Each structure stands twice: as structure tokens, then as C-alpha cells.
């Protein structure tokens, strides 16, 4: 993938993150902490529903794309099993609509359930259609499909604010539904030829079984990973006030700016590394990429630590602790991104069943720490638990991949990852000593990165120059 295509794919995450950074303060000023906490529950619920109903077939689509001649048949074989499961679960859950709403949002309003269900359906179909654009390397279309729903969400919130519509959770839900519906329409238009061809293709039950054999282990792993990701939300929902969940949600939303890096890299990395493997390329390049990604992770953390105090000027007074929480909240997306490089051997060797045990251990670490820390420290306990669990997750994925595929030097990687976790926790504790303390810490860390990664930076610059040719 050349530089032009990389930039096309980068446009979506960058634009979406920029719009997200605008939307978060607007939501914080316009809606209560409790409603923002409920919006976080909605996001987590949609994620869980997708993980279950996808049956791992979205990953199977990516894995088999370059090895399959009949791509419409591949799309159909991956789409229909999950769609049937989604419809069955929707019918079963509809019987308990009010009870589910009470459990999720603290209010027994059946309307909340139905809107949540519509959000899940639109997100499910959009996920598969987005894979078409991703695998065809249609970066600009893929990016615009990410930016447009963010614009719709921001516009909907603006309408709520300026027209005097009641600023309550129902309005937030409808804004979220409008954004997911918009992206579905955009994806459907951009991939109309592909899904129409898939619709006309003949079903092949044997082929579907083959794909399920690859994806099925990822279902359990995915649900456990959802637990790893959502433990903070769940424990805050039941062990702390909704206001603490709202504080955590805003912090996580700002930290989601790191998802620019995660999203761009993930979109590019999976097709690239599988293409390398299929072409018999030198897979020693994976180690070089891992060091360059680690360098980027360190720089992102340092810059965020230096400038996180700016959140005080963007958010209401009740969110003043966000600047201390945000560094810990950055660790999960960054560790996941780094692990995508170091664990590539698991996917190449098709030993995906191992991911279940890796994720389970990290999930249990998160649960145990969250149960201990969240009741005492609220959002602060949640971000520390989450960050620690993701470091465990990263290290286990790396070690397993090294054992079953190719071994590579890891001491430097582990040293900097441990140092990053320690510094983020120190930043959280420095709230007693003022802003200048943690800013000074990260200012000292940045030159250290330059010293230890100067060779990797040079190699990365050379690679970028080469891609322009």
C-alpha cells in the first residue's frame, strides 16, 4: 500500500477523531453526566451485540479475501449466519424490553430498548459493507463513511441545543441512531455492486462451515475481549454513581483520539501482513514495524501528558480531573495497536483459539482490579484497572506469538511499555501536586524516546520516502 492510499485511509480516522473532540465538550456542556454515562452504556451494548452476532466471520472475510476468487460468495457466506442470529436474539430480547432497559440505563422505558436494537442492526450491516471498501483499498470512500456519521451526530446535538428539545437521554439515543443509519446508507451506496452480486450468488453451506471453523473461536475470544473492554463501564454502572461513569466516558472519549493511530494502523496492517505472507515476503519486517509502532506509542503518550491540561478549558468545572485520568485511558487503545503487530503469528498460523485464553487472563485481571479499585476511587480506579489489564493482554499476545511463530527481541519493548504504565499512574497520583509536576515528567520522557528510537525513526523516514516513488 503506497503513501497515497495510506493517507486516504488516514483521512477517516483523523477527521472522525477531530469531530469527536469537538462533540465531547459540546455533550459535556449540554447534557448531564448521568446521560453521558448512559450513552457509554449504549456504545458498549452495541459492541457486545456485534461481537456475538458477527460469529467471527468479519475476521474470516479479511483472512480469506486474498485467497478467494469468488469474493461475492465470500461476502454472502460471512454475512447471512450472523444476520439470522441477530434476528433470533432480537425477537427473544423484545419480550423483556423494559427489564433490559432498566438494567442498562436505570429506567424501565421500552423505547430505549427499541432504539438500541435499531442501532445494533444498522451497525451490523455497516460493519460488513465497510470491509468491502477496506479490502479493496478504497481509502477515500472508507474515510468519508467514517466522517459523515460524526457530522450527523454533531449536527443532531446542535439541533437539540438550539431548538429547545429536551436535553435528555432519549434525544442522545436518537442522535446516535441517526449517525448509524447515515453510515449504513453511505456504505450501501458505495458498495452497491458488491452486495448486489453477493445477493445473487449461490449459498454454499460447506464453505460457510469452513469460515465458521476459523471465526468460531474468535466469537468467544471477542466476547471475553468485550468484557475486558467493558469491565470499567459495567463496574462503574453498578459500583459507582452514574456521574462517575459520565466522567469516565468523557475521559475515554478524549483518549479515543489515540484511535486515530489505532484505526489507521489496523486498517492498513491486517491486509498488508497477510499479503506479505501470501507472497512469501521476508516476515522479519514485522519486528522492525513493532519498534516503529512502539516509538509512535511513546511519542503519543508524551505529547498527551504535556498538553492534557488543555481539557480544563474545554470542559465544565465538574470534569477537572480528566487531565489526570486521560493518560491511563490512552494505554488500552495504544497497547491493542502495538499488540496487533507483535501477535501477528497467531493469525498467520491460524491458532486463533489461543486468543481466548490470552483475553480471559487479561479480563480476569481487569475484573479483580476493578472490583477492588472502582468502589474506592470511581473513575480513577477504572482507568488504572483497564490500563494494567491491557498491558497484561499485550504481553501475553506477544509471548504466545513468539512461541508459535517467530521469536524476536522483546526486552526493549517490555521495558518501555512498563515505563509508560508507571508514568501514567504517577500522572494520576500527581493531582495532589498540581499540573506542572506531571508536565515536567513527560517533558523529561520525550528526549529519552528520541535517544532510544533514533535508528527506528530514521528507518521509518526512509520507508516513507521509498513509498513515494
Protein language model features and the residues they cover:
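Signature of the first transmembrane helix
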Residues: 2-58, 86-94, 119, 154, ...
